[in-house]
Amino acid sequence: MNWTSENYYFTKLNKSELPELIHFYLVTTREHYKLDSYSEEAYKFDFESLMGEDQIFFDCSIYYVLRSKLHNSIYACIRITFWDKETSLPIQKLFDIETESLLIPHVTNFWHIGRFVISGKIVGNRINILKKMLFDAFYGPHCLGSGLVIAECDRKVVNTLRKLEIESYQLGDPIIYLYSETLPIYIKSEWLEAFIEKNKYSQLSVGNNVDIQKFVEMSNRMLLRSKNIE
């Protein structure tokens, strides 16, 4: 299906739609890497593993998805999570990274980005979808400032980010995860400045400011909780 605004629409995911998103993510990954031997047992293991992660992080996350207007199926997705600095992130388990290694001094807000994939069935100008998904996901970290975006990221995606003027820092050696060479990285919120400013005119929507308010409320709750613990 060709990419046009007449064929697709951007929206956000409800918690009840998580199984649909995880299925889309795994199937799209399998198709991208042409995994003809992807067994039912392997799919079930991956599905349950990712569902477990997303159920833990859903309430402090926003999932941006692209859906078809024709049959409402998901064709692209990305997740941005406001991290509480306590719950173990996927990157920590995969790369054996201690929490202390991620808590960089003088950084207030910590984020995790994931579930980023665009269906290969979309033809045409896919760069517009890419920019929109990234803009929505990165707008919160950019606006709240003093932030660090953490991710386990496919090497090709890291290279794409660099082409979009988004630099990243590699935390360790790559591994093969979900069939691709995956790097542990972080992106400082100030490194998002060029990308956000360059795309603000074409990508900013009212919904982005609504999302900012949600993240501000999360930040306030986490700050209050930490003071109560002290």
Where are these regions (language model features)?
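Conserved beta-strand in the GNAT
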Residues: 65, 72-82
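Active-site beta-strand termini and strand-to-loop segments that position acidic
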Residues: 66-69, 187
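Residues in well-ordered beta-strands of folded domains
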Residues: 79-81, 114, 186
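Acetyl-CoA-dependent GNAT
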Residues: 80-86, 105
